[in-house]
């Protein structure tokens, strides 16, 4: 469960950091937006190292489902774009995949 909370925090940082670049390049915001953006992206990378997984690739794969759902929620909360049924179905499929990767029974390598 710790990984799930870590992934949620990481998603917030990644999306906020990337949005800072989006705001600068696409919305004509000040380059000063890049400062908190880069800090958020650095915190995102650090948070992913806290995932309860011995393998980086598996942690990143599981994180992907959380990222997708979080990005849709960001679009709704920050950009006012309510997810449609296809967004919700797609995110649900990704979260099922994330659950299989994160919570599936594992045997530890020797």
UniProtKB/Swiss-Prot annotation:
Keywords: Cell inner membrane, Cell membrane, Membrane, Transmembrane, Transmembrane helix
Localisation per UniProt entry: Cell inner membrane
InterPro entries hit by this protein: UPF0060 (IPR003844)
TM spans (from-to): 4-24, 31-51, 59-79, 85-105
One Pfam family in the UniProt entry: UPF0060
Domain of life of the source: Bacteria
SUPFAM superfamilies noted in UniProt: Multidrug resistance efflux transporter EmrE (SSF103481)
Keyword Transmembrane helix: yes
GO cellular component: plasma membrane
Location (main, coarse): membrane
Membrane topology: Multi-pass membrane protein
PANTHER family for this protein: UPF0060 MEMBRANE PROTEIN YNFA
Protein name in the entry: UPF0060 membrane protein RPA3838
Organism: Rhodopseudomonas palustris (strain ATCC BAA-98 / CGA009)
